[in-house]
């Protein structure tokens, strides 16, 4: 019953059924019954938290201190659950406070653990013990602190709890609180004085656990109590170490601020820095480095912080550590340095950082691998590039590891070599050469690298060129040291067992036994010999294994092993020399054999010349051979050398038996005989033994007798060294003579070469004998050529490297003095001779190397420089072409001499070249005309130079392209003089765009370069000028100015003194001018450029190759032959030390008609051109040109000058673009910083990816970019022109007329012409523009695409110039009288009335007495309108006599035009420049009536096409003057003008005298004009040679007809005809008026003829130029035969015609002006498509008609006139 009742009570308590419980309790008084767990109803109610039930049970007498099975009481349960009211009731009922459960926990403990703050407070108020401990001695405060109950901690501390109490492991409440970051608990404990340094479990302090958990605030609180921050846990980790590993940056900073030690290692040895690096925490690493953490402490496995950073691949961290200068060579236990590790990880950035810091590439790991081994084994080209960027490290390619592998052989073992690509690497840090101020380290290292290349095939001759006394000998010593370090890196061989060892040991022990057998006893001898044999082999075994052991204790074994191996190898070599034929060496492309060098003692050759010095030189080389190969080997080789008759068998044979068999037989006989003697002695009893002994003695004696000669040779060779033989031969020089002595030297040299080759084949090495010739420039001059010939003869075969160190100018001068007449007559000079001998010229230019960094350039694809989209396309083609194999290019046959060899030779050459260079030579061997002169020897020389230059470029961190470098080297090698002109211009001219091609630059200065060797002897060193022009124009990639700036500092084959010579000569000319001559100094390139003209010749023909006339714009005309002034003294030519004078001292002075060629002179005044009738200023033409220049773009702003904002604005202006996408496009442009310069140079595909436009927008944007690029490519060369024209004074009228985009062809009627006056005296013409005091232009600008190409008619015009110069004073006086009278008559014509008669239209052509005019028009044919009034004031001066002396001859036709600011005479147009001088020179003294007027062709442009008017023929003009189609004078003025003109014509002084006088010079002129010769040496060419090789074949037939005298062109669409200008008509003689010269655009200037020009009667452009003196007059031209050819020839020029708006100029009040489009100016607007241009061209060309047959008589007329 009680059980049921009690269960019911418990059930009611569980169900919290209070009424039922009360009812039940009233019936039953037993309330302390238990359930199965021993719990009473009170415990259950206290646990459930039902206060009423608890009260009811307590009221009914429930015992509150009863325990269940786990020793829990009701108070403990209530405290655990936090029922405060029940706890209070239980305490009132007397519950026990200190009762413990089975775990020893009291009610307070549970309340603290559970965080029941109010319960804890209640219990403490009732006196609970706060220091009670439970299991593991844990206090309530520890539980409260560990679980973050801050209030309870505070209560406990207030009630006396121990603040520093600890549990069983010593962990205090502070440690527990800090472990979980309970900040408030930590604060309370610290406030009560908790010990911050007390260690708990695992030796952790509160600071350590707080740091480990990353509780920053707790750490800060603890640090405020000044703890010991350097305490460590059980693993040796400090708080800082833990924070660094975990990456708590703020905590680390706090700890560092608290003074924590940063270098305390943990138990493994890792420091805080290493821990931070391993964790990858960059900021922490930086913080530690700022606190001077030790970066070189080795941690676990000897790894430093730097190594760990490298291993983690964190480049930022590596960079930070490297800034603190760590030791980069500390190895790990595996021997790896950080560089080796970075190389293994292929981390290019880290490798580059380490190399920049000076990490050694020579470091090796435990396997002996260097970083190069690792990189090449891993096939990483970029890593290998970085590791090899210093030339000194190139020697590591040949350093073997412990397995015997070299990086070079590792690379050879792969099918695709990367070492051939490495030498196209990007940059090398020259930190190791900073101390070498002269840059010799780079020179020596690069040369040593080339000469140490295993695949380099000697012989080779290197020329070290520098001025005498510049330190070449110092470089030689450095070069020798470098070559030794490159070569002497082979590991010492270790001892190996071999059959030779067995044979030698047996022979030694047997001999020792025989000795003892003779002297002591046979048995003892056997015992001793066997014991000795055993000892020897025990010793060998110890040495064998000990030499391969690592450690210092075995160094003695290694030393003995290497010494034994060396001596045994030498013995083996001696036996091989005696008994074995040398094997063939393998091809160097499959296995690179190690190289060794032997040097001559070059000091003994200084200041010595002749046979004795050569003997001494070879003797020193033989001494070096003896030191290297050994005394016996070198001297015995003379006896045992292999004869060619031996064949390729392995063994040398004697009597058909191998020699070693006979040798072993003889040795065996000797040993057997000695053995028998030792055993049996000499006893007559032993007959058999005696017989055997006699036989043995006979065999041995016979062998000795038969080899007496050999023994004598051996004895002679051993006693007489090669040095002794050479000296004895030198002492007998008087008997041997020179030829005999040379034969002795040759034999000795060949013997040395064969010896080196033989020993190399046995030892598997490459020996190269280096002959150093120093002091050759100090030898006697007559010995120099002999020395060079001797060296060439002696060392032209075999493994020789000849190094000349000399001053090339002294040597070449000596050669020139000693060359025989045959060579001189063959145009072979000293320079050609040296070029033929020297395979690798190196000019020491330390200044260039020091400035190399200025030219450091970068590009995206290994040096591809993109100028524009077009250039980029060309380079893509280049890259595709360059991938062709060398085998394909050797199929070219006629273009290369390489394919004449057999297949094996060609394959060997192919492999050699491919291995030697990292670029394909296809482009050098393509069918270019310039290659026709390149021989295999020249190609080898080019390869050597390119290789050295490439290494120097890499050493200076200059990125380059191999194709461009090869083109540049070829240019400097074949044409050094002209290339020096290009370089000099680039050095002296600022502001040139980098993309300007060398062809454009050459066209600017071509007329400044002398063309004959008499003017400039240095022209001898250049190749054919025609090939030079073809190379510049047709070679791809096209070289630009940027390439010159890139390559020049490291170009070793170009003599820098050439530029000094050119500058000195130019300065000397100017100095002569300043010295008092009447001529102005001629600057190289001063004066503003002129605007382009449609009449200009294409750029390709504006060259000095075909230029044989006077030099325009600052360069003199060709001077007379050198014999003309050979006896004079003057400035010495720096190169040949010969008298050198400015040619204008001997030839007439020439001034070009263009205003751009002369220096600005203040003596010439100018004003705005005005119309004389209304005084209104005329347009200068420049603004019109600019307006027409960029009509489509709407702005003259160039693409490359646009900013990002301008590009965005330009984008918004594109029609058809999606406006909704515009903000996105603009954002992309700004984000990517796409400015105009980027657009002008970037790759289109990359731009497309970056812009991410939709299809339509992209094509619109792309077309805009390409269009602006095209515009800029036209504008870029003309930028200087714009600059100059903007800054110049108003342009003269003649310039403005020609610059305008459309020029009106003026009317021929004089009534509609504006009257001009021409009143210049001789004195005025002489001094015009020549004021010396005027300042020069400071802007060094050049003309761009247009060129002046006036020329003398003869290719060899010196003779004619001399004869013309020798005109007598009487002739000149007669001419002056005639000219003075002519001026007076012309003044009368124009002076009396205000008529429009033009005074100076007809030219006296006085200038042709001296053959210098380039203007076909009259001297006074043009006059600016602004000079009208001044001309009237100067009429009197114009009549003054001008006394001309012979040296003062002036070209009046051109001297009148001097500056850009003032041009009193009309500047000569492009027709004039291209006009042939021949025709004009033949007519020097004619009056205007007798002078043949130039035939005129009307040119009109219809839609951009060419239209020609028919020219009057004989039939048209054979009648009277009135029969002319268009009268030149109107009605009443006609007769007046004719009368006055007739008076002029009848002047005796003006007519007869000049003709009579000039007939004397007819034969000279005609000879000079007709006898043209084509000479490539003189730098000029005849009119048969055309620079346009691309059109050569198509125009082959037409080219024969283009030499005709006269061309008549007619246009069927035109019925009206126009007469000739009055200025050229004279008396309108129909025969004279019929004569015309048409210029050809594509011809060279030497073939050009003459045409007149004036601003009033603008002559139309003539499209063809012909030399009247070249073609027989009987040839008739039919232009219809080849219209297509002619169109092709004109295509280049015509395709550039753009659409322009018409501009009409009205020089006078003409009632009906005719506006005709002019082609003078090619506008820089949108190009028409080439296809349409070509179609138009073909159509127009087809309209050309045949010339009139009567015109063929012009040649006879010319002769009759003469």
Swiss-Prot record:
Its main location: membrane. PROSITE patterns: ANK_REP_REGION, ANK_REPEAT. A motif (PDZ-binding) lies at residues 1757-1762. Residues 1-508, 555-668, 718-1680 are cytoplasmic. Expressed in developing nervous system and in highly plastic areas of the adult brain. Also expressed in neuroendocrine cells, where it concentrates at the tip of neurites. Expressed in developing muscle and is concentrated at the neuromuscular junction (NMS). SNTA1 can regulate its localization in the NMS. Residues 1338-1350, 1452-1462, 1579-1590 have a biased composition (Polar residues). GO terms for molecular function: PDZ domain binding; protein kinase binding; protein kinase regulator activity. ANK repeats lie at residues 45-74, 78-107, 111-140, 145-174, 178-207, 211-240, 244-273, 277-306, 310-339, 343-372, 376-405. Tyrosine phosphorylated by NTRK1, NTRK2, EPHB2 and EPHA4. Phosphorylation at Ser-918 is induced by phorbol ester treatment. Phosphorylation by NTRK2 is induced by brain-derived neurotrophic factor (BDNF) and neurotrophin-4/5. Phosphorylation by NTRK1 is induced by nerve growth factor (NGF). Residues 1089-1092 are annotated as: Mediates interaction with CRKL. Residues 1395-1422 have a biased composition (Low complexity). GO terms for biological process: cellular response to nerve growth factor stimulus; dendrite morphogenesis; in utero embryonic development; nerve growth factor signaling pathway; positive regulation of neuron projection development. Residues 1423-1440, 1529-1553 have a biased composition (Basic and acidic residues). It holds the Pfam family SAM_KIDINS220. Changing residue 1760 to D: Loss of binding to PDZ domain of SNTA1 and SNTB2. Keywords: ANK repeat, Endosome, Membrane, Neurogenesis, Phosphoprotein, Repeat, Transmembrane, Transmembrane helix. Promotes a prolonged MAP-kinase signaling by neurotrophins through activation of a Rap1-dependent mechanism. Provides a docking site for the CRKL-C3G complex, resulting in Rap1-dependent sustained ERK activation. May play an important role in regulating postsynaptic signal transduction through the syntrophin-mediated localization of receptor tyrosine kinases such as EPHA4. In cooperation with SNTA1 can enhance EPHA4-induced JAK/STAT activation. Plays a role in nerve growth factor (NGF)-induced recruitment of RAPGEF2 to late endosomes and neurite outgrowth. This is Kinase D-interacting substrate of 220 kDa. The gene is Kidins220.
């Amino acid at each position: 019953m009680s059980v049921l009742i009690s269960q019911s009570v418990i059930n009611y308590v569980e169900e919290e059924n209070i009424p039922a419980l009360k009812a039940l309790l009233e019936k039953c008084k037993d309330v302390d019954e238990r359930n199965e767990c021993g719990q009473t109803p009170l415990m259950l109610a206290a646990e459930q938290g039902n206060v009423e039930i608890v009260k009811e049970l307590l009221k009914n007498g429930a015992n509150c201190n009863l325990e269940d099975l786990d020793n829990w009481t009701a108070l403990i349960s209530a405290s655990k659950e936090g029922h405060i009211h029940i706890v209070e009731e239980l305490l009132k009922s007397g519950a026990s406070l200190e009762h413990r459960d089975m775990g020893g926990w009291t009610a307070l403990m549970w309340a603290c653990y559970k965080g029941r703050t109010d319960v804890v407070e209640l219990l403490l108020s009732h006196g609970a013990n706060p220091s009670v401990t439970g299991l593991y001695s844990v206090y309530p405060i520890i539980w409260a602190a560990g679980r973050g109950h801050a209030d309870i901690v505070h209560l406990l501390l207030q009630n006396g709890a121990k603040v520093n109490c600890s549990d069983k492991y010593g962990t205090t409440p502070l440690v527990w609180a800090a472990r979980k970051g309970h900040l408030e608990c930590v604060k309370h404990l610290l406030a009560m004085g908790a010990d911050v340094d007390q260690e708990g479990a695992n030796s952790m302090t509160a600071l350590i656990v707080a740091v480990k958990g990353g509780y920053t605030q707790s750490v800060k609180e603890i640090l405020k109590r000044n703890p010991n921050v350097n305490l460590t846990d059980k693993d040796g980790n400090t708080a800082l170490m833990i924070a660094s590993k975990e990456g708590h940056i703020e905590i680390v900073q706090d700890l560092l601020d608290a003074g924590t030690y940063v270098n305390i290692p943990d138990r493994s040895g890792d420091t805080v820095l290493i821990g931070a690096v391993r964790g990858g925490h960059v900021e922490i690493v930086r913080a530690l480095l700022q606190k001077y953490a030790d970066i070189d402490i080795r941690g676990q496995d000897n790894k430093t912080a730097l190594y760990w950073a490298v291993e983690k691949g964190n480049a930022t961290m590596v960079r930070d550590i490297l800034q603190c200068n760590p030791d980069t060579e500390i190895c790990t236990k595996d021997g790896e340095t950080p560089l080796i590790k970075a190389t293994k990880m292929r981390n290019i950035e880290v490798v580059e950082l380490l190399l920049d810091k000076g990490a050694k590439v020579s470091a090796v790991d435990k396997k002996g691998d260097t970083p190069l081994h690792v990189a090449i084994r891993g096939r990483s080209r970029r890593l290998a590039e970085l590791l090899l960027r210093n030339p000194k490290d190139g020697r590591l390619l040949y350093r073997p590891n412990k397995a015997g592998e070299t990086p070079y052989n590792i690379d050879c073992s792969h099918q695709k070599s990367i070492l051939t690509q490495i030498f196209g690497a990007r940059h090398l840090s020259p930190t190791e050469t900073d101390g070498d101020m002269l840059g010799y380290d780079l020179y020596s290292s690069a040369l040593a690298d080339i000469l140490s290349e295993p695949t380099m095939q000697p012989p080779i001759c290197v020329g070290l060129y520098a001025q005498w006394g510049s330190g070449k000998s110092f470089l030689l010593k450095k070069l020798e040291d470098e070559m030794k370090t490159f070569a002497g890196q082979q590991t010492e061989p270790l001892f190996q067992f071999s059959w030779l060892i067995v044979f030698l040991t047996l022979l030694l022990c047997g001999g020792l036994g025989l000795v003892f057998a003779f002297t002591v006893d046979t048995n003892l001898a056997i015992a001793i010999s066997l014991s000795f044999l055993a000892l020897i082999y025990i010793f060998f075994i110890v040495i064998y294994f000990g030499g391969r052991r690592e450690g210092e204790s075995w160094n003695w074994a290694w030393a003995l092993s290497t010494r034994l191996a060396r001596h045994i190898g030498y013995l083996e070599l001696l036996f091989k020399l005696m008994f074995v034929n040398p094997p063939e060496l393998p091809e160097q492309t499959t296995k690179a054999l190690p190289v060794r060098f032997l040097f001559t003692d070059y000091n003994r050759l200084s200041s010595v010349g002749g046979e004795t010095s050569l003997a001494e030189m070879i003797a020193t080389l033989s001494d070096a051979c003896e030191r290297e190969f050994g005394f016996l080997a070198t001297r015995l080789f003379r006896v045992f050398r292999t004869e060619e008759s031996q064949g390729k068998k392995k063994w040398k044979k004697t009597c058909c038996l191998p020699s070693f068999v006979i040798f072993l037989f003889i040795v065996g006989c000797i040993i057997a005989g000695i053995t028998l003697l030792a055993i049996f002695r000499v006893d007559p009893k032993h007959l058999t033994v005696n017989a055997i002994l006699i036989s043995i003695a006979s065999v041995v004696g016979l062998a000795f007798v038969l080899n007496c000669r050999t023994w004598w040779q051996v004895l002679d060779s051993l006693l007489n060294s090669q040095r002794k033989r050479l000296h004895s031969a030198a002492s007998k020089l008087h008997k041997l003579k020179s030829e005999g002595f040379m034969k002795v030297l040759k034999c000795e040299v060949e013997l040395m070469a064969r010896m080196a080759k033989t020993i190399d084949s046995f030892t598997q090495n490459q020996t190269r004998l280096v002959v150093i010739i120093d002091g050759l420039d100090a030898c006697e001059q007559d010995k120099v050529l002999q020395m060079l010939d001797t060296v060439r003869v002696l060392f032209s075969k075999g493994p020789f490297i000849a190094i000349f160190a000399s001053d090339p100018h002294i040597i070449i001068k000596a050669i020139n003095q000693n060359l025989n007449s045959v060579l001189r007559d063959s145009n072979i000079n000293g320079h050609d001779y040296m070029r033929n001998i020297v395979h690798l010229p190196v000019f020491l230019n330390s200044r260039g190397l020091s400035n190399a960094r200025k030219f450091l350039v970068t590009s995206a694809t290994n040096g591809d420089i993109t100028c524009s989209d077009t250039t980029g396309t060309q380079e893509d083609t280049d890259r595709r072409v360059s991938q062709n194999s060398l085998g394909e290019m050797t199929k070219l046959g006629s273009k290369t001499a390489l394919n004449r060899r057999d297949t094996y030779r060609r394959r060997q050459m192919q492999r050699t070249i491919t291995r030697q260079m990292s670029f394909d030579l296809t482009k050098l061997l393509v069918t270019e005309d310039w290659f026709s002169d390149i021989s295999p020897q020249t190609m080898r020389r080019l390869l050597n130079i390119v290789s050295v230059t490439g290494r120097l470029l890499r050493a200076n961190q200059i990125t380059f392209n191999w194709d461009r470098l090869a083109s540049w080297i070829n240019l400097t090698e074949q044409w050094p003089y002209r290339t020096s002109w290009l370089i000099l211009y680039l050095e002296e001219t600022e502001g040139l765009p980098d993309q300007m091609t060398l062809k454009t630059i050459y066209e600017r200065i071509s007329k400044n370069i002398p063309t004959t060797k008499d003017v400039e002897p240095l022209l001898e060193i250049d190749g054919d000028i025609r090939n030079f022009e073809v190379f510049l124009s047709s070679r791809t990639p096209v070289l630009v100015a940027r390439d010159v700036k890139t390559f020049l500092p490291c170009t070793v084959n170009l003599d820098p003194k050439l530029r000094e010579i050119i500058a000195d000569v130019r300065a000397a000319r100017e100095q002569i001018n300043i010295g008092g001559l009447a001529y102005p100094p001629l600057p190289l390139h001063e004066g503003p450029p002129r605007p382009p003209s449609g009449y200009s010749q294409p750029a390709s023909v504006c060259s000095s190759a075909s230029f044989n006339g006077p030099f325009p714009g600052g360069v003199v005309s060709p001077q007379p032959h050198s014999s003309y002034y050979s006896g004079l003294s003057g400035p010495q030519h720096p190169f040949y030390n010969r008298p050198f004078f400015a040619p204008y001292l001997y030839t007439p002075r020439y001034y070009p008609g263009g205003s751009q060629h002369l220096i600005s002179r203040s003596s010439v005044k100018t004003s705005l051109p005005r119309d004389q009738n209304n005084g209104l200023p005329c347009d200068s033409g420049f603004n019109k040109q600019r307006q027409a220049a960029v009509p489509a773009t709407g702005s003259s702003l160039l693409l490359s000058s646009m900013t990002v904002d301008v590009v965005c604005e330009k984008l918004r202006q594109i029609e058809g673009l999606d406006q909704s996408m515009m903000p996105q496009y603009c954002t992309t442009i700004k984000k990517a910083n796409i400015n105009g310069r980027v657009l002008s140079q970037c790759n289109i595909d990359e731009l497309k990816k970056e812009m991410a436009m939709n299809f339509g927008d992209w094509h619109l944007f792309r077309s805009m970019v390409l269009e602006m690029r095209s515009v800029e490519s036209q504008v870029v060369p003309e930028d200087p022109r714009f600059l100059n024209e903007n800054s110049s004074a108003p342009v003269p009228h003649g310039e403005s007329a020609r610059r305008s985009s459309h020029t009106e062809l003026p009317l021929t009627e004089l009534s509609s012409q504006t009257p001009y006056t021409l009143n210049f005296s001789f004195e005025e013409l002489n001094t015009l523009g020549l004021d010396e005091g005027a300042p020069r232009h400071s802007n060094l600008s050049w003309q761009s695409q247009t060129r002046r190409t006036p020329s003398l008619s003869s290719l060899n015009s010196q003779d004619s110039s001399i004869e013309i110069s020798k005109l007598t004073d009487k002739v000149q006086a007669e001419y002056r009288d005639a000219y003075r009278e002519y001026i007076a008559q012309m003044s009368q014509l124009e002076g009396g009335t205000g008529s429009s008669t033009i005074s100076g239209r007809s030219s006296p052509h006085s200038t042709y007495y001296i053959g210098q005019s380039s203007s076909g028009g009259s001297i006074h044919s043009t006059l600016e309108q602004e000079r009208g009034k001044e001309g009237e004031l100067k009429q009197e001066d114009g009549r003054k006599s001008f006394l001309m002396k012979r040296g003062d001859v002036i070209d009046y036709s051109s001297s009148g035009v001097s500056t850009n600011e003032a041009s009193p005479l009309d500047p000569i147009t492009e027709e004039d420049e291209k006009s042939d001088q021949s025709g004009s020179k033949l007519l020097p003294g004619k009056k205007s009536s007798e002078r043949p007027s130039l035939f005129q062709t009307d040119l009109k442009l219809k839609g951009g096409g060419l239209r020609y008017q028919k020219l009057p023929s004989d039939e048209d003009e054979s009648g009277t003057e009135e029969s002319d189609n268009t009268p030149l004078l109107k009605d009443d003025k006609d007769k007046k003008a004719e009368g006055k003109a007739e008076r002029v014509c009848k002047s005796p002084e003006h007519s007869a005298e000049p003709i009579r006088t000039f007939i004397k010079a007819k034969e000279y002129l005609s000879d000079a004009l007709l006898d043209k010769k084509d000479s490539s040496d003189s730098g000029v060419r005849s009119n048969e040679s055309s620079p346009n090789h691309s059109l050569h074949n198509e125009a082959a037939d037409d080219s024969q007809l283009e030499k005709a005298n006269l061309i008549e062109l007619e246009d069927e669409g035109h019925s009206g005809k126009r007469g000739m200008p009055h200025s050229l008509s004279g008396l309108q003689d129909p025969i004279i008026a019929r004569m015309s010269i048409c210029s050809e655009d594509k011809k060279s200037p030497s073939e050009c003829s003459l045409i007149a020009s004036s601003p009033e009667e603008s002559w139309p452009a003539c499209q063809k130029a012909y030399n009247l003196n070249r073609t027989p007059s009987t040839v008739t031209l039919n232009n219809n035969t080849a219209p297509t050819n002619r169109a092709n020839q004109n295509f280049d020029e015509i395709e550039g015609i753009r659409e322009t708006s018409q501009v009409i100029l009205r020089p006078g009040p003409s009632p009906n002006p005719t506006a005709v489009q002019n082609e003078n100016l090619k506008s820089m607007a949108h190009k028409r498509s080439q296809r349409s241009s070509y179609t138009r061209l073909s159509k127009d060309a087809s309209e050309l008609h045949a010339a009139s047959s009567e015109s063929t008589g012009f040649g006879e007329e010319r002769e009759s006139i003469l």
